[in-house]
Amino acid sequence: MFEILVIDDDRSIQMFLKRMLEKQGYEVITASTGEEGILRTLDSPPALIICDWIMPGLSGIEVCDRIKKDPKLSTTFFILLTSLDSVADRVKGLDAGADDFITKPIEQNELQARVRAGLRLHQLSQDLHTQKLLLETELAEATEYVKSLLPLPVKKPLNINFQFLPSRQLGGDCFDYNWLDPDSIAIYLLDTAGHGLKATLPAISVLNLLRSRALKDLNYYQPSEVLAALNNTFQMNYQNDKYFTIWYGVYNRVSRQLTYASAGHPPSIMLSGSSPTNTEVKRLKTPGMPVGMFPEAKYVDASCYVEKSSTLYIFSDGAYEITQSDGTLWSLESFIQILISLQYSVDNQLDYILNYLIDLNSKENFEDDLSILQVKFD
């Protein structure tokens, strides 16, 4: 049974509305002032409120405004009872959050019809809210599943750690690292176009495919061949128009050679040196279109020698494409300078980097997924 709250300082109108609505099968409670009406609403939120516009103390407009500003009460259907019928007055009421109006003197059939319509809309709002909560629960479960797929930080023989912050509950970034043999480790990070579930599913597919080495007859030690195989497998025409950028590298700890290839991805940054003023910065990137854009795309390998005590950062563009408080976009070069400045001053660089980016971001949430892999070489 729907509960209706009637707020009116006129006792006769209270009783008239109460009797009429109870005959329609509704449960009706009453209040004589705006303050009392708000307290009753907070104590037991009704499905619909009929409130007089002009009352001593809080007016109907003020009551409506306060109730509608409470997120828990925003779906309560609010009808203003008024003798005012000018356009300006109605605009004022609508701006305060009123859903409908009933003009005095009250016409019984009109009132009953407006109440029925208001309760239908309230029920629809409640149903949508229930579906929203269900969807949020399912998305939270999916998020936990995605997090369970990500690798754990490792300490030996390489120190690998990461920060992962999706822009929504589900993100399009994904990464992994796994040993191909006792001396060679594959490390990669990909960024699927878009956000949310449609971006997450292709990322999970790539992760599972590479982790299980399901692409037969593929040389996983050769990054360019891996990217070419992924490009053949994940053409966007068959993937809901989703493409992705990726950086893929293989490090051999005996030869200290890092072989890598990229597909439209930001360069990975290798830092070597002993101080901020004595740091060699290598931008590790090869030419190549994002995976899935063109069937004939070609990819090439590059390699570098890894100096002792070097640090490699692999990241998505969400790590530096951040809108600052002045409306300008932060830059890759600024991000690299932060990496350099923290390289020798603190041990847990990733925590400091993430906190810096959170403070830098001018919006409540990041506009893009943010992933940073850190590999410290001995």
Where are these regions (language model features)?
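Acidic catalytic/metal-coordinating carboxylates
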Residues: F2, S32-E36, A47, S59-D65
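The feature encodes the CheY-like receiver
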Residues: Q14, P56-G57, D65, S74, ...
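Charged docking surfaces used in two-component/phosphorelay signaling
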Residues: M15-K23
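Active-site beta3 strand of CheY-like receiver
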Residues: S44-I50
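Receiver (REC) domain active-site loop signature in two-component systems and cognate sites
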Residues: M55, I67, G93
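… and, occasionally, acidic/histidine-rich disordered N-termini of signaling adaptors
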Residues: H129-L312, E364-D378
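Active-site-proximal, acidic helix/loop segment immediately C-terminal to a metal-coordinating Asp/Glu
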Residues: L197-Y220, V306-E364
